[in-house]
Amino acid sequence: MATPRSAKKAVRKSGSKSAKCGLIFPVGRVGGMMRRGQYARRIGASGAVYLAAVLEYLTAELLELSVKAAAQSGKKRCRLNPRTVMLAARHDDDIGTLLKNVTLSHSGVVPNISKAMAKKKGGKKGKATPSA
């Protein structure tokens, strides 16, 4: 007895795990890295999805802050370079604590003038210290 054509099984579209979850970061690659790194004996399927989503969120947040910092530089063109990414990360409290031990190459240092090096206002000019 043949089955009618309308009773065929529903064909499921194939696609990546990232596309199924609505993410840009590669869920399969993150899961493979978790398994190869041997962080645990068993890793569930949702663990890779969750980690990829967290990484994607943090990256989007850092890029958003970097674009704002580059736009505030006052130049006509907005260009992202390691320096603007580092400055944006260091000036944000949450991301700054996450990345406080991270060194970004070709980014320089955060400009900071210590109070001891700053010029003191209201100093007396007339008195000179005797040198012996």
From Swiss-Prot:
Keywords assigned by UniProt, alphabetized: Chromosome, DNA-binding, Nucleosome core, Nucleus
CDD domains: HFD_H2A
Any Pfam family the entry gives: Histone_H2A_C
Keyword flag Cell membrane: no
Gene Ontology MF, one: DNA binding
SUPFAM superfamilies on file: Histone-fold
Subcellular location: Nucleus; Chromosome
Gene3D superfamilies listed in its UniProt record: Histone, subunit A (1.10.20.10)
Domain of life where this protein originates: Eukaryota
A GO cellular component annotation in the UniProt record: nucleus
Subunit and interaction comment: The nucleosome is a histone octamer containing two molecules each of H2A, H2B, H3 and H4 assembled in one H3-H4 heterotetramer and two H2A-H2B heterodimers. The octamer wraps approximately 147 bp of DNA.
Known function: Core component of nucleosome. Nucleosomes wrap and compact DNA into chromatin, limiting DNA accessibility to the cellular machineries which require DNA as a template. Histones thereby play a central role in transcription regulation, DNA repair, DNA replication and chromosomal stability. DNA accessibility is regulated via a complex set of post-translational modifications of histones, also called histone code, and nucleosome remodeling.
Family named by the database record: Belongs to the histone H2A family.
Protein name: Histone H2A.1
The organism of origin for this protein: Leishmania infantum
